[in-house]
């Protein structure tokens, strides 16, 4: 269990509780979770973070009424900056989006500006939103993470409790390499409900070569770990930076959809540009 799982800041969340669904606009449904909850135990301070990045959300179940009462549908793309005070709790985000369902807006731009305003207020940080008509995305190919997949290893694993022990002495030789490694075996659990979260992860770095078996064992050790998506990515970035000491590092995870939302956090200390094309499980 994470050291802050019972923190008072989490007590008021609707997550894990029975809730009523509202279909008229209500910004108060949004709930934030302080990023400091997981950053403080990692020694990460808001004024001296070792990374930049964003939490990228895809909104698949977004609908409202136009001025004449005709339902509208869109796919939304949201980017929440890493410097925001809070991350957005996903169940509250879903409930908030449902409140648009029977609400009339004059035009698409009003919807976009409403989303940006409410999300930035909840997160206490910078948020950008884009809305896409379905015909803009139809025929979009399924993407893939560029890099070498490390999953097909003939190894025995019998421990699924989170530990950084696998990263001890996990670099080999003195030669500096630059490579991108990918795993589709990332599985963690919701901090509150302990429901499984499934993801693919891309790790791009420059530095002494990281032992792929040790890295895979470390990633698999998240299997019983309870944290939100964004927190897991920051933990992985921090652990790799601490133990492997690469010159450059980027960590990007794309998680499968739940409640019409997928969350795709990335953190980097280089000029990394994340691909936003959905993966095969998304």
Swiss-Prot record:
Annotated pathway: tRNA modification; tRNA-queuosine biosynthesis
Transmembrane stretches, start-end: none
GO function terms (MF aspect): preQ1 synthase activity
Homology family: Belongs to the GTP cyclohydrolase I family. QueF type 2 subfamily.
Cellular location(s): Cytoplasm
Binding site for substrate: 88-90, 229-230
Entry EC number(s): 1.7.1.13
Gene Ontology cellular component terms for the protein in this record: cytoplasm
Function noted in UniProt: Catalyzes the NADPH-dependent reduction of 7-cyano-7-deazaguanine (preQ0) to 7-aminomethyl-7-deazaguanine (preQ1).
The keyword Oxidoreductase is assigned to this record: yes
Protein name, UniProt field: NADPH-dependent 7-cyano-7-deazaguanine reductase
Biological processes, Gene Ontology terms: queuosine biosynthetic process; tRNA modification
Record's catalysed reaction(s): 7-aminomethyl-7-carbaguanine + 2 NADP(+) = 7-cyano-7-deazaguanine + 2 NADPH + 3 H(+)
Subunit structure, interactors included: Homodimer.
Gene3D superfamilies: 3.30.1130.10
Keywords assigned: Cytoplasm, NADP, Oxidoreductase, Queuosine biosynthesis
Active site annotation, chain numbering: 190, 197
PANTHER family: NADPH-DEPENDENT 7-CYANO-7-DEAZAGUANINE REDUCTASE
Top-level EC class as recorded in UniProt: oxidoreductase
Entry annotated with the keyword Oxidoreductase: yes
Record-linked Pfam families: QueF (PF14489), QueF_N (PF14819)
UniProt-annotated binding residues for NADPH: 90-91, 258-259
